[in-house]
């Protein structure tokens, strides 16, 4: 049986690892063993942060909606309650986009949500 020489495969494997680690600082971009270890950590961070990014965007959308509805004189949670009662099924991503790009349409949605809300139970009683 012929002898199998693995130098070509080994060099290719190392080259690929070092190419993927090219943006790292110091030894992590130049030494194979350090680069390989850093790549393993990077994959872990990447997996974790792909999940976290979804929550980050949701927080951003909520902040944008909250700022826009407070300008209309209503709080975020009352606005969401009003949307639910009015039967408007827009997600937070679409609402945030409307608040930024089309304030007039967003204002109309806020008015519909306000109209669907019951009377404020925490308002001071009129004498």
UniProtKB/Swiss-Prot annotation:
Keywords: Ribonucleoprotein, Ribosomal protein, RNA-binding, rRNA-binding. One of its GO terms (biological process) is translation. GO terms for molecular function: rRNA binding; structural constituent of ribosome. SUPFAM superfamilies: Ribosomal protein L20. The keyword RNA-binding applies. CDD domains: Ribosomal_L20 (cd07026). It comes from the Bacteria. GO terms for cellular component: ribonucleoprotein complex; ribosome. Belongs to the bacterial ribosomal protein bL20 family. Binds directly to 23S ribosomal RNA and is necessary for the in vitro assembly process of the 50S ribosomal subunit. It is not involved in the protein synthesizing functions of that subunit. This is Large ribosomal subunit protein bL20. It comes from Bifidobacterium adolescentis (strain ATCC 15703 / DSM 20083 / NCTC 11814 / E194a).
């Amino acid at each position: 049986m012929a002898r199998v020489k693995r130098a070509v495969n080994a060099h290719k494997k190392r080259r690929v690892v070092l190419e993927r680690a090219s943006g790292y600082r110091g030894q992590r971009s130049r030494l194979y063993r350090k680069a390989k270890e850093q790549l393993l950590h990077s994959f872990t961070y990447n997996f974790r942060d792909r999940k976290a990014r979804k929550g980050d965007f949701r927080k951003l959308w909520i902040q944008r909606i909250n700022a826009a509805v407070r300008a209309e004189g209503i709080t975020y949670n009352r606005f969401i309650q009003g949307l639910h009662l009015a039967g408007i099924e827009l997600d937070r991503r679409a609402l945030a986009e409307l608040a930024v790009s089309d304030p007039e349409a967003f204002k109309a949605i806020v008015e519909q949500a306000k109209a669907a809300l019951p009377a404020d139970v925490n308002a001071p009683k009129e004498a």
